[in-house]
Amino acid sequence: MKLIIEETTEKMSESALQIVLGEMMQDKQVNISLTSGRSPEKMYEMMVPAIKGKAKYKDVQYWLFDENPYDGDEYGPNWYDMQKMIFGPAEIEDERVHHLTRENYTEYDEQVRRAGGIDVMVIGLGWDGHFCGNCPRCTPFDSLTYRFLYTDKQKLNPTYKDRPTQPYTYTMGPQSLMRVRRLVMIVNGSEKAEIQKRFIEEPINEDVPATILKLHPNLTVIADRDAATLLNPDGYENI
């Protein structure tokens, strides 16, 4: 694992974007997977003008790694958020955006494999240590893509809000992410300082499921200074 601490969220976003654009420049079909949420907002602001209308990125395929579909709808909030933050502004056609559904989740990993595998994935670190849709105390560490009944997840994580119109979570599991060639985690904000410290310092455990990702052979963690306030990089022998 490589740990990079940048002074600001903007610098963190620039570093992550450089990695993503570097992977996108490969002379082949490139497959990337990007996160929704707050952490990547600045990165997407920078990414839109960098890729919009650029022919050299026309073969890039985008894969969403989790979803909570609404009843009666093929899509969920992650799809809509990504359309708003990056796919719409960058004018990326729906045909190049692949997403998890009720029908395809059991075949999603095989679809990714047939497409050539994910070249780079950018994820965030959840406030409780979750990653993608893999949440505390209910993440099967040996699983590829799977679905989980949301009410069961909520029983194990009582602070989670009710989602009566979103009965299931569909997510790429830990073993799906282990197949990604380059994994980038971005972490920003002082509210993430405690969970960032736990992720770095604790052994692999179900209470902080993201700790399993430290086994990935090519993981880069990029944090801003606020998220890294509790870290002492000089004291980490294994980073």
PLM region spans:
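Glycine-rich beta-strand-to-loop/alpha-helix junction loops that act as flexible
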Residues: 34-39, 123-127, 188
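Ligand-binding beta-strand-loop-alpha-helix segment within the catalytic cores
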Residues: 55-122, 235
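Active-site histidine-anchored catalytic micro-motif
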Residues: 58-73, 117, 131, 140-144, ...
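A short secondary-structure junction signal
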Residues: 110, 132-137, 143, 195-199, ...
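Class I SAM-dependent methyltransferase SAM-binding "motif I" and its flanking Rossmann-like core
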Residues: 127-175
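ATP/nucleoside-binding phosphotransfer catalytic cores, i.e., glycine-rich phosphate-binding loops
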Residues: 180-239
